[in-house]
Amino acid sequence: MNWNPFRKKDVTESVDPLDVKLSRLKPGYVLDYDLKTWQVSAHHHYDYDGKRSDEWELSASDEVVYLECSEDDGFTFTLTRKIRISELNADIPIFIGENEDPPDEILHKGITYEADSSSVGRFFKNGEGTGDEFIVWDYFDESEKRTLSIEQWSDDRFEASLGEIVEDYQFSRILPGAVTEAR
């Protein structure tokens, strides 16, 4: 590409580093949580019949977690990690095939999770496209702080994740990532 001194520089949204909030993360941002520095590697969102929920993929060395933010009466944050569906105590895909829903109670590593809700939604990877439809079943432990989710993406594709409800004050040093100029 030839150099052109008269071309307009790409205009990027300026970010006030003193006004960066957990609910407004973008790819490239870094933040501290649980004695680790995490980088936001992606920003996805879900649509549950008009209710939006944001999800950020956070990476630290070889670990990946997902921070989901939903807004009802304020922001609720959930931090989750993917697990293999086969780690759960029941053969979930077969159970759903026979009963249309997973069991009301799931035991995982000594913790009992009770069914709380189910939703049909659309997932927008990187916030783009028409979205992929899925069904999610959400569970909570007795304290209602730990979560388990089962997602069905097709007749034979299931995913599971374990998580916990977190508070925004548990995250610190939220900084915008380096801005690179397009050439």
Q: What annotation goes with each model-predicted range?
A:
Residues M1-R183:
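Mixed-charge, low-complexity intrinsically disordered regions
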